[in-house]
From Swiss-Prot:
This is Leucine-rich repeat protein SHOC-2. LRR repeats lie at residues 101-122, 124-145, 147-169, 170-191, 193-215, 216-237, 239-260, 262-283, 285-307, 308-329, 332-353, 356-377, 380-400, 403-424, 426-448, 449-470, 472-494, 495-516, 518-540, 542-563. The gene is Shoc2. Component of the SHOC2-MRAS-PP1c (SMP) complex consisting of SHOC2, GTP-bound M-Ras/MRAS and the catalytic subunit of protein phosphatase 1 (either PPP1CA, PPP1CB or PPP1CC). SHOC2 and PP1c preferably bind M-Ras/MRAS, but they also bind K-Ras/KRAS, N-Ras/NRAS and H-Ras/HRAS; these interactions are GTP-dependent and both SHOC2 and PP1c are required to form a stable complex. Interacts with PP1c in the absence of Ras GTPases. Interacts with M-Ras/MRAS and RAF1. Interacts with ERBIN; disrupts the interaction with RAF1 and Ras, preventing the activation of the Ras signaling pathway. Keywords: Cytoplasm, Leucine-rich repeat, Nucleus, Repeat. Residues 1-88 are annotated as: Disordered. It comes from the Eukaryota. It comes from Mus musculus. It is found in: Cytoplasm; Nucleus. GO terms for molecular function: protein phosphatase 1 binding; protein phosphatase binding. SUPFAM superfamilies: L domain-like (SSF52058). One of its GO terms (biological process) is negative regulation of neural precursor cell proliferation.
Amino acid sequence: MSSSLGKEKDSKEKDPKVPSAKEREKESKASGGFGKESKEKEPKAKGKDAKDGKKESSAAQPGVAFSVDNTIKRPNPAPGTRKKSSNAEVIKELNKCREENSMRLDLSKRSIHILPPSVKELTQLTELYLYSNKLQSLPAEVGCLVNLMTLALSENSLTSLPDSLDNLKKLRMLDLRHNKLREIPSVVYRLDSLTTLYLRFNRITTVEKDIKNLPKLSMLSIRENKIKQLPAEIGELCNLITLDVAHNQLEHLPKEIGNCTQITNLDLQHNDLLDLPDTIGNLSSLNRLGLRYNRLSAIPRSLAKCSALEELNLENNNISTLPESLLSSLVKLNSLTLARNCFQLYPVGGPSQFSTIYSLNMEHNRINKIPFGIFSRAKVLSKLNMKDNQLTSLPLDFGTWTSMVELNLATNQLTKIPEDVSGLVSLEVLILSNNLLKKLPHGLGNLRKLRELDLEENKLESLPNEIAYLKDLQKLVLTNNQLSTLPRGIGHLTNLTHLGLGENLLTHLPEEIGTLENLEELYLNDNPNLHSLPFELALCSKLSIMSIENCPLSHLPPQIVAGGPSFIIQFLKMQGPYRAMV
């Protein structure tokens, strides 16, 4: 039985700020990056589009996702709901725009089915935003807007575009995301001034050879379509900086991709890639490479020539080894994700290969040992995720990992943590859940910066008194162990907001628990020997969630227990010696 004991807080969403033209230009040059995947939301005023992929990894892992299609900004309509505009209202907007000689018109979220032909009179327009309407087609008259530089048509039901758009000789940005296109309209290939083309989330199956007619393209996003191959002519896009082909059906890349030497961001995640061409090594400007969720079994040695590479994501492939010295050659690499592959050993290359790495994710492999000294030069390594491997012990130099901030060793076969864990003085997050730990080292108390400690599903019978020194601790998870008591020092953890004690053998809670003034969540469920609760618990004034399922609590009146956590807290307040204080 769990209960919410607190009051809901009012929250107000701030209106998005209207971006200036200068900000929009700056944003259009930006590319995305690795990060956690998130669900795509309906674009707000900034038109942000950040959906990325299928799965998430653990909270403590380094970045694993890669998204670049998030750079559109547009003027700010009133936030919130879609406006319903009659044809007359739209015409009124068009007339107002003409009379004021405005260069920018935003008709987004108006439920527009048909754009009036009178739009042709707005020849001064440079920006036209029609996001999130119900357009199935555009009138040919849009082709009269010869000064148009930005045309944003995302989230409509377009199946084609009029040929008259080839009159838009100044058009630089075309946004066709979230429509119903089955092919790239032929007129698009004639818009040779385009620098930015968004075609995300349509039903496109092919990219034609005519893509070569768009030599000024610096951003091409065709993610989330049904594309099975790219034409060799993609290599003629020599100004391409960002290429996003994620979530398609590619099995191979054309070797001509190596001609796109200006590319800094290449997102190929969630395809069916079986290999990479050796020419990928020609991408000397490449900064981010996303290859997660493909079918790769090997990485070409030529990738070592991509010396500008900072982020490499190879999650969920069939890779068991990397070319020797590959990582040592990538002298700017700071984020490496090798999770969900077939590694049984660390990559060959010695300590130098991790000298620039800030974040390393090796989750869900078959590694049974971290080599001694492998991180001896890893002076900036802050995040290490070794979750779900086959580790039985930690290396003797474990205590020298002084730069570590987040360490995830969950779901291994560790039976002990070395005493020299005390050397990890920068550690803020330590995840040790689902191991075989029976006790914790006294040196744990030296981790004074620790904010989160997860020890769920081990075999702990007690906690060291030194845990009282972890005064910055906010989250402590001890669920599913064999604890019968807690040290009195638990009361020193005054910053604790979450305390998980479910599925243990607790017989009582120490009265010092009442000093946890910031405690918001307390989980006591499934403690079959817990017959009472201390009156001091009523002093935890911020407690909003308490779980007591399957706890006998026989020392409390049955009718109080039956009422649930809120009744119990009220009882402790009213009957205890602290009633004047709460």
